[in-house]
UniProtKB/Swiss-Prot annotation:
It catalyses: D-glyceraldehyde 3-phosphate + phosphate + NADP(+) = (2R)-3-phospho-glyceroyl phosphate + NADPH + H(+); D-glyceraldehyde 3-phosphate + phosphate + NAD(+) = (2R)-3-phospho-glyceroyl phosphate + NADH + H(+). Pathway: Carbohydrate biosynthesis; gluconeogenesis. Belongs to the glyceraldehyde-3-phosphate dehydrogenase family. SUPFAM superfamilies: Glyceraldehyde-3-phosphate dehydrogenase-like, C-terminal domain, NAD(P)-binding Rossmann-fold domains. Its main location: cytoplasm. It holds the Pfam family Gp_dh_N. This is Glyceraldehyde-3-phosphate dehydrogenase 2. Gene3D superfamilies: Dihydrodipicolinate Reductase, domain 2, NAD(P)-binding Rossmann-like Domain. Involved in the gluconeogenesis. Catalyzes the oxidative phosphorylation of glyceraldehyde 3-phosphate (G3P) to 1,3-bisphosphoglycerate (BPG) using the cofactor NADP. The first reaction step involves the formation of a hemiacetal intermediate between G3P and a cysteine residue, and this hemiacetal intermediate is then oxidized to a thioester, with concomitant reduction of NADP to NADPH. The reduced NADPH is then exchanged with the second NADP, and the thioester is attacked by a nucleophilic inorganic phosphate to produce BPG.
């Protein structure tokens, strides 16, 4: 039995979720709602500057894409309430436009007949925020309809924080995400409500805000108010880095910290968190499927309890892999996902 999925919005994350979902024999991507022609969408799926050429045949049909012989319906509506989710018996909509992250707006998909909505961003008044590997056990299929997959940075930060807190206890901390530029910035200097993001993204290191530390309290509520942070947008197109400094409740060594991450990577956080002691750089983590990869060579301890940890993440592919994991997690707990 496959879960029937529709993707609303086909930008960077929408397309990566599509690529990953098409590899999963438990998921049927029924439809894509996007504003561009079939020819344009087919081309953008087949050829990707960051993640390379798609290894499946993609053909533009009439109001559809044909991927390795499988038809995916193409729609073009700016109003979720007008989408034919009831007609196609859609179980889960992946909301990837960035425009419908508030619950009242995302509910348009439910009014149209979908059973659940997964937001590929932090939500507003969402029913629950889930970070796989951290709090997926909090999902309640009876109560939760609008589900946020949080942000790519929160997906990196939360597993790292959880390991440190469970192993050693966290008093407080500060994080910086050294983040690849995104579509929310300008290629050349142009107006933006954030005057730093108004500057050319390929030319400067750009300090700006991140909600990752604040959002952490949604998945690890006992740490509310204990972590804060900011972002540095840097001139690379993909792969980012969380730089976390925490004060722990117990004395540790760098070796003990790294061993804790190694254990988690092999057990409770297998597939979500990984560990590396190789001298790698950001491009080496392109298309890495993990939410966070600990850079063991850079772990530092000062005065026994102040710890610095670096964690790499592919902010596009790694995050999209967690969206697909969340689809499977939600579908497995729904009473009657559609039979295919």
């Amino acid at each position: 039995m496959k879960v029937k999925v529709a993707i609303n919005g086909f930008g960077r994350i929408g397309r990566m979720v599509f690529r990953k979902a098409m590899l999963d024999d438990q998921i049927q991507v029924v439809a894509i709602n996007a504003s561009y022609s079939a020819e344009t969408l087919a081309h953008l799926i087949k050829y990707d500057t960051i993640h390379g050429r798609y290894d499946k045949e993609v053909v533009a049909g009439e109001d559809s894409l044909i991927v390795n012989g499988k038809k995916v319906l193409l729609l073009n509506s700016r109003d979720p309430k007008q989408l034919p989710w009831r007609e196609y018996d859609i179980d889960i909509v992946v909301e990837a436009t960035g425009k419908f992250n508030a619950k009242d707006k995302a509910m348009g998909h439910i009014e149209a007949g979908a059973k659940k909505v997964i937001l590929t961003a932090p939500g507003k008044n969402e029913d629950v925020t889930i970070v796989m590997g951290v709090n997926e056990d909090q999902f309640d299929a009876e109560r939760h309809v609008i589900i946020s997959n949080a942000s790519c940075t929160t997906n990196c930060l939360a597993p790292v924080v959880k390991v440190l807190d469970e192993e050693f206890g966290i008093e407080s901390g500060l994080m910086t995400t050294v983040h690849a530029y995104t579509n929310d910035q300008k290629n050349i200097d142009n107006p933006h409500k954030d005057l730093r993001r108004a500057r050319a993204c390929g030319e400067s290191i750009i300090p700006t805000t991140t909600g990752a530390a604040k959002a952490l309290s949604l998945v690890l509520p006992h740490l509310k108010g204990k972590l804060h942070g900011l972002a540095l947008r840097v001139p690379v197109p993909n792969v980012s880095l969380v730089d976390l400094v925490v004060d722990l409740k117990t004395d540790v060594t760098a070796e003990e910290v790294n061993e804790a991450f190694k254990r988690a990577a092999k057990t409770s956080m297998y597939g979500v968190l990984d560990y590396s002691d190789e001298p790698l750089v950001s491009t080496d983590y392109n298309t890495n499927p993990h939410s966070a990869v600990i850079d063991g060579l850079t772990t530092m301890v000062m005065e026994d309890r102040k710890v610095k940890v670096l964690a790499w993440y592919d902010n596009e592919w790694g995050y999209s892999c967690r969206v697909v994991d969340l689809i499977r997690h939600v579908a497995a707990r729904m009473k009657h996902p559609s039979a295919v």
